[in-house]
Swiss-Prot record:
Keywords from the UniProt entry: Ribonucleoprotein, Ribosomal protein, RNA-binding, rRNA-binding
Gene Ontology CC, one term: small ribosomal subunit
The encoding gene: rpsS
Protein name: Small ribosomal subunit protein uS19
Pfam families reported in the protein's UniProt record: Ribosomal_S19
Lineage of source species: Bacteria, Thermotogati, Deinococcota, Deinococci, Deinococcales
An example Gene Ontology biological process: ribosomal small subunit assembly
Protein function: Protein S19 forms a complex with S13 that binds strongly to the 16S ribosomal RNA.
PANTHER family: RIBOSOMAL PROTEIN S19P FAMILY MEMBER, SMALL RIBOSOMAL SUBUNIT PROTEIN US19M
Matches recorded under SUPFAM superfamilies: Ribosomal protein S19 (SSF54570)
PROSITE patterns linked to this entry: RIBOSOMAL_S19
Family to which the UniProt record says this protein belongs: Belongs to the universal ribosomal protein uS19 family.
Amino acid sequence: MPRSLKKGPFVDDHLLKKVDAQNERKDKRVIKTWSRRSTIVPEMIGHTIAVHNGKQHVPVFVNEQMIGHKLGEFSPTRSYRGHGADKNAKGSKKK
């Protein structure tokens, strides 16, 4: 269910303060955050935000196409390595 337009996008205050401070200083350092739920807003364009995935911070460079999406969408939490190989298919067949 989408968020109501009258409420506007949700961005954690501490994250928005860090982005605004870097915009004022014209600084482009990496911003670490655990806020995967924050929506990407136009003020974040050009910044690299390191989003926590539960184990480490994944750097995400924000561009125009990402506006309106959540930060967590660009930092996967699960790694799929494929299903296990069938032990019988490799060598001998059953008789």
